[in-house]
Amino acid sequence: MHRPSDYPSTLLWLLDETHVTVTAGTAIAILWTQKAHCLWFAAGALGSTLIARIIKKMIRQPRPPPSSPTTKAAPVRPKQTYGMPSTHSTALGFYFTYMWPLLPLATSSVWGERAALAVITGLTLWSRVELGYHTVTQVMVGTAVGVNSALGWKALWNSNSAIEIQLQTLIDTVRDKVVSRFS
């Protein structure tokens, strides 16, 4: 793991580490809420990134060439995978599109939460280009993959109530078995 001082700015370091906080936050939300919709959302986000990785292996477009060492936004570490589409952008597109209509979650400030979601998403998408990990096109295509995945995944959820029933039954069964082992 890189230190903040390895980056051109602390902001870029924070944005480069969003995958850790987003993954941890999603896992905590699943464990905390124990709700089928939360698990469905996480499975869709994971599925969208798997789709991006498959597309990436099919297209095989390289990442942008490394910047010169004198460039302020020189990448911290070279990425060894292909760049099209950006998997981070796919996940961000999915999260943004799926979460937007669900906000507010816990407060009455719908526009405050939506503004925070938009700013964090926008800054993180920008950072993928600024750090030299992706081209603008790779980020845009990744975002489009995520947006379309979220729309399809949400449509599946809305059109089939059996999904919620089956997932909630699974969650409750697993929880009960885990709790009974420690009781």
Q: In which residue ranges do the predicted regions lie?
A:
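Membrane-embedded catalytic cores of phosphoryl/pyrophosphoryl-handling enzymes
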Residues: S68-S183
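N-terminal transmembrane-helix/juxtamembrane module of multi-pass inner/ER membrane proteins
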Residues: M1-I30, A36-G44, T49-Y82, T173-S183
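Structural signal for the C-terminal ends of transmembrane alpha-helices
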Residues: A29-Q34, W100-P104
